[in-house]
Amino acid sequence: MRPRSRAGDKFMSQGQELCHEYFQLTAPCEKQPCIDMCSSKYKTGKGVCGPAVHQCFCTFSCTV
């Protein structure tokens, strides 16, 4: 399994009901591992690759 993220390379922002977290990966993002990483870390997490090649972008509910 490829490394998920490097320490210090992620940040969180909070909107009204949804939060977001970027993971800076050491390898190019792949769709299914990104989805799995977000859903395993956050109960309501949805993952997509991008906007950069080495990023996984997670969106999840802040209220859960």
From Swiss-Prot:
Q: Where is the signal peptide?
A: none
Q: Which GO terms describe its biological process?
A: defense response to fungus; killing of cells of another organism
- The cysteines covalently paired via disulfide bonds are C19-C62, C29-C49, C34-C56, C38-C58
Ordered alphabetically, the record's keywords are: Antimicrobial, Disulfide bond, Fungicide, Plant defense
Query: InterPro entries of this UniProt entry?
Result: DEFL
Q: Name one Pfam family in it.
A: SLR1-BP
Similarity remark: Belongs to the DEFL family.
The name this protein carries in UniProt is: Defensin-like protein 123
| Organism encoding this protein | Arabidopsis thaliana (Mouse-ear cress)
